[in-house]
């Protein structure tokens, strides 16, 4: 499989835990696919961010969405503002349209268009991040058609570079220094922006590097038992812990493993 689109996800926070017996094999399968899929270039996994903003959910609570091997997609309106249902979080890579999306309908009586909203009842509208993720999967297919030699990490980086940043959102600048002599714009709603098919394909056509699971480099820092209490969150001010990595790396992902004992998770 070159591209795996996943318009689904776990509902309860922390329920899809890759360290648990139930989901350990799922992560092993993802790792196998990024290491061996497409003859070692890696399968591209695309996941919906989810439609649970109202309940306070966050993609950081779900290992399928926050894994470095996956591309997590949020949903925006046609007016380029975030959809009210789209689950936020720092693990979102990009976004695509999540309402008013025209697609083929189910056949027969299972169809969603029985009242004839369209002259041809084979089509209907659908919405949600289940609609936005397949658009990104389709764009990834166009990227691979333009350049079959892209590694799965190249695909992620190209989407990072090529997504557009509408002025309908507020943006933060990350610490990168390899994009227009500065950092990337990012926010927790749209990721690095709204996916741009033309820009992504054009970038893929001229892309020279090949970043795969086999040339990925890691650096790690370990902190001992902090023996600290977590205060109630007031004005979004929490605890601040810092560590330093001395290796000279281009950082693509940061993974934090933490063991917290608390009466309430989430």
Describe the predicted segments one by one.
Residues 2-107, 158-164:
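Catalytic-core segments of hydrolase enzymes
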Residues 2-4, 99-190, 194:
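Hydrolase catalytic cores
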Residues 13, 54, 78-79, 132, ...:
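Short, electropositive, low-hydrophobicity segments enriched in small/polar residues
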Residues 50, 186, 194-265:
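Secreted peptidase-domain scaffold signal
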Residues 72-76, 179, 250-253:
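Short Pro/Gly-enriched beta-strand edge/turn motifs at strand-loop
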Residues 82-86, 91, 184, 189-190, ...:
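Short Gly/Pro-enriched turn/cap motifs at secondary-structure boundaries
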Residues 93, 138, 199:
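Alpha-helical scaffold segments in soluble metabolic enzymes
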């Amino acid at each position: 499989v070159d591209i795996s689109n996943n318009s689904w996800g776990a509902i309860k926070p922390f329920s899809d835990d890759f360290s648990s017996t139930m989901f350990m094999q799922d992560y092993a399968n993802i790792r196998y696919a990024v290491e061996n899929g497409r003859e070692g270039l890696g399968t591209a996994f695309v996941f919906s961010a989810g439609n649970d903003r109202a309940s306070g959910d966050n993609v950081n609570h779900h290992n399928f969405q926050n894994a470095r091997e996956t591309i997590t997609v949020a949903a925006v309106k046609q007016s380029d503002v975030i959809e009210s249902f789209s689950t936020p979080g720092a693990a979102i890579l990009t976004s695509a349209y999540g309402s008013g999306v025209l697609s083929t309908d189910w056949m027969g009586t299972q169809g969603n268009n029985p009242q004839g909203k369209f002259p041809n009842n084979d089509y209907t509208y659908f919405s949600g991040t289940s609609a936005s993720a397949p658009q990104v999967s389709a764009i990834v297919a166009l990227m691979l058609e333009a350049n079959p030699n892209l590694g799965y990490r190249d695909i992620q980086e190209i989407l990072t570079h090529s997504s557009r940043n509408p002025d309908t959102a507020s943006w933060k600048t990350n610490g990168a220094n390899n994009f227009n002599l500065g950092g990337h714009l990012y926010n927790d709603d749209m990721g690095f922006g709204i996916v741009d098919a033309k820009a992504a394909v054009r970038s893929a056509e001229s892309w020279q590097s090949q970043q795969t699971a086999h040339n990925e480099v890691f650096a790690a820092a370990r902190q001992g038992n902090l023996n600290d209490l977590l205060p109630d969150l007031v004005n979004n001010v929490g605890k601040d812990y810092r560590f330093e990595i001395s290796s000279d790396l281009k950082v693509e992902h940061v993974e934090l493993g933490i063991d917290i004992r608390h009466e309430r998770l989430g």
